């Protein structure tokens, strides 16, 4: 894109959460008792964590989302401000607890299982979307949780000539209309198969490209990196080997790293280089427990890329 210079580099519209992370030596069996080896609380949520990543990587980031008015909601909102993310566009639901997750982390495998709760009063509606706010950046990131609101936001951005990205995990009602408004589709590993019914990764990405006409469609592959399709070109980017403590939030950091690598690199940067930058950011995040504790700096990413 030909990036303009509005108030922010990136605006993110979507989910925030607060996580309680519970580490155990191995995943508990049914009807068993398991000692907790470590426990922490951390702010999280897909888009909120991606905006923190962008801010740590030197971008001017704004977050649009709704918080509860309990202690978790207040903490989640404050955590963004402390990270330099603008929260002037945020909303609060009265007498409503914030979105909350309990995350079981298997210490031996580095894997996690998420149990979550998000009251419907926290949902964003299309009427919550103000064009002047979602179009205040050079790039817009949305997720797939409140599909109608995300579709409205993406339409506003596209009408203003602002590139749109999505972090999409699940097939939900309205997802087709949403994807049709997106320029860069970044999916979880399973989403392309669920959406298209195709049995191979490459074929499923091509089906998404043909149906929704994005400039890029990419699936994250965990420790194996990512697979992207730009036009007819497949770009497979290897993951980075780092000591893994917890993968919570790694996909969110991948999206934030992608946006930062794209904006910092400008039009001269190749898609492969942007994807390597995003993979490095996501890998380094896994060094600590929690979605945001180990989000890397630009220097840490550059060091890993040169290694």
How should these model regions be labeled?
Residues 1-11, 35, 201-307:
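Conserved phosphate-binding/catalytic region of the ribokinase-like
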Residues 55, 158, 263:
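Gly/Ala-rich phosphate-binding loop of Rossmann-like dinucleotide-binding domains
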Residues 84, 119-125, 164-170:
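Short gly/ser/thr-rich secondary-structure transition/capping motifs
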Residues 79-95:
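A glycine-rich helix N-cap at a beta->alpha junction
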Residues 1-66, 71-82, 108:
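Glycine-rich phosphate/adenosyl-contacting loop at the front of the ribokinase-like
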């Amino acid at each position: 894109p030909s990036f303009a210079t509005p108030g922010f580099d990136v605006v993110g519209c979507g989910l925030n959460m607060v996580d309680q992370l519970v580490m155990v030596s191995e995943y508990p069996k049914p009807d068993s008792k398991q000692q907790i080896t470590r426990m922490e609380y951390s702010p999280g949520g897909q888009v909120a964590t991606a905006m923190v990543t962008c801010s740590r990587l030197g971008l001017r980031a704004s977050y649009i989302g709704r918080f509860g008015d309990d202690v978790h909601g207040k903490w989640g909102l404050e955590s963004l401000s402390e990270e330099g993310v603008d929260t002037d566009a945020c909303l609060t639901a009265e007498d409503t607890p914030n979105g909350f997750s309990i995350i079981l982390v298997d210490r031996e495998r580095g894997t996690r299982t998420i149990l979550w709760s998000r009251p419907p009063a926290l949902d964003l509606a299309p009427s919550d979307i103000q064009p002047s706010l979602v179009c205040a950046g050079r790039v817009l990131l949305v997720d797939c949780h409140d599909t109608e609101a995300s579709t409205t936001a993406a339409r506003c951005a596209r009408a203003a000539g602002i590139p749109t990205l999505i972090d999409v995990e699940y097939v939900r009602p309205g997802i087709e209309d949403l994807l049709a408004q997106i320029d860069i589709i970044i999916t979880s590993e399973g989403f392309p198969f669920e959406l298209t019914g195709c049995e191979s990764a490459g074929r499923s990405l091509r089906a998404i490209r043909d149906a929704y006409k994005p400039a890029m469609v990419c699936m994250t592959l965990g420790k194996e990196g990512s697979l992207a399709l730009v036009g007819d070109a497949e770009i497979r980017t290897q993951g980075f080997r780092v000591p893994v403590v917890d993968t919570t939030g790694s996909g969110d950091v991948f999206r934030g790293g992608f946006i930062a690598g794209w904006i910092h690199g400008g039009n001269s940067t190749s898609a492969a280089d942007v994807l390597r930058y995003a993979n490095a950011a996501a890998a380094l995040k896994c060094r600590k427990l929690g979605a945001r504790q180990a989000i890397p700096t630009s220097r840490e990413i550059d060091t890993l890329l040169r290694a």
